[in-house]
Regions:
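Basic, amphipathic alpha-helical/coil surface patches used to engage anionic, phosphate-bearing ligands
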Residues: 2-223
């Protein structure tokens, strides 16, 4: 948990007055930490309490800096009636985004649907190294979310994967997240996606459609 002290320096009559304000959010998080120190609390309960604290922060904090990137959003339902979460890899710049806020926004976006079956569509199109967070952050996210996030995730579609993406997904799902290994599906073309979801509902950015035509020809394009 992070603790924040905000120092407000005011200058008057040549003297410096320091006003120290304790962030109420940090006080609440500190209380959770104190409760988790109790030996009687089992690991599952501790994890749930930490996540509940994270969920509270996700609802209360200002996350517009992440929301404005539009890198993750809900996009209706697939053809089996499952909620769809869209992740645009190119719009996620880990060097320019607060990763703690990114996690909070992910939780705010995804948590309302995880009690039912849902799928994720990840567009790897035209990404660079700056769009790919560290393995340790991905592991942190996976270990932070609750069981429902993993159990009710029915498919994770990677659109326009590279060889590196395939190898990374295989390694992570084999050694760190075997519960989702069989849920990862690589899709080389948007036509592969059309059998699963209504593409019009996904709000696919134009650059993805353009790149798909470069990679796969004009078979996708429908004027």
């Amino acid at each position: 948990m992070f603790y924040y002290l905000f120092y407000d320096f005011r200058f008057s009559s040549g003297k410096t007055t320091v006003a120290v304000n304790l962030d109420l959010d940090s006080q609440a998080s500190s209380l959770v930490d104190d409760m988790l120190d109790e030996d009687s609390v089992d690991d599952d309960t501790k994890h749930r309490m930490r996540f509940d604290d994270l969920l509270r922060r996700a609802q209360e904090e200002d996350l517009t800096s992440v929301e404005d990137t539009n890198c993750i959003y809900r996009a209706g339902y697939d053809k089996q009636g499952r909620s769809v979460i869209v992740f645009i890899g190119k719009w996620f710049r880990h060097s320019q985004i607060n990763l703690e806020k990114a996690l909070l926004y992910l939780v705010r976006t995804v948590d309302p649907v995880v009690d039912q079956d849902y799928v994720v569509v990840y567009f790897h199109t035209r990404t660079s190294r700056d769009n790919i967070p560290s393995y340790w952050w991905i592991k942190h996210v996976y270990n932070t979310v609750t069981y429902n996030y993993k159990k009710n995730l029915k498919a994770f579609y990677v659109v326009h994967p590279t060889l590196w993406t395939k190898m990374t997904c295989w390694w992570f799902s084999t050694f760190m997240a075997p519960a989702i290994k069989n849920k990862i599906h690589n899709l080389n073309a948007l036509t592969d996606l059309s059998a699963i979801v209504n593409e019009q509902d996904l709000g696919i950015p134009m650059f993805i459609t353009e790149q798909d035509m470069v990679l796969n020809g004009l078979r996708y394009y429908q004027p």
